[in-house]
Amino acid sequence: MGATASPSRSPLRSDGFDVLYFGAVDWSHTWQRPQQIASRLAAQGRVVYVDPIGLRRLRLSDAPRLVRRLRGNGGLPAAIPEGISLIPSHAATLAAGLRAPSEWTARLVASAVRRALAEARVEHPVIWAGTPSPAVVAALDGLPSRLLVYDCLDAVT
């Protein structure tokens, strides 16, 4: 199991619909709307949560978070709610932060997500996009889906 592609921590349930959730905040960050929504969706079925992919160039202040992500722990809490599986976006975050072409980043993201979905036996999830990241938008074409929900609450600069 590769660290970036493997869902981690919680076994997935299959009694409802499946959701592939592109989060706007790291799962391990302060508990906010994206984690609340994903947790509630997990009560209905399986949720594969993808940590956010960079929206801007990396800054020096991003170094500690980036190091945690690249090491593979991302500052994860001890427990992830039942029904949620997490895909950290290590390589994609670095590529996006360095402004690699979004097509490259999209390939990294789509490949990691396809592997994780296959491991979880998720075939046609509802995709919930919580960020307008160019890499996420570009990756959508390469992913199977039943429905796309675009849910961006905040202005992203």
Model-derived features with residue positions:
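A conserved catalytic-core segment of Leloir-type glycosyltransferases
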Residues: 2, 13, 52-124
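Short beta-strand/turn micro-motifs composed of small residues
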Residues: 23, 51, 129-131, 152
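An aromatic- and histidine-rich active-site surface loop
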Residues: 109-110, 126-143
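A short, histidine- and acid-enriched strand-loop-helix "catalytic/donor-clamping" loop
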Residues: 135-136, 152-157
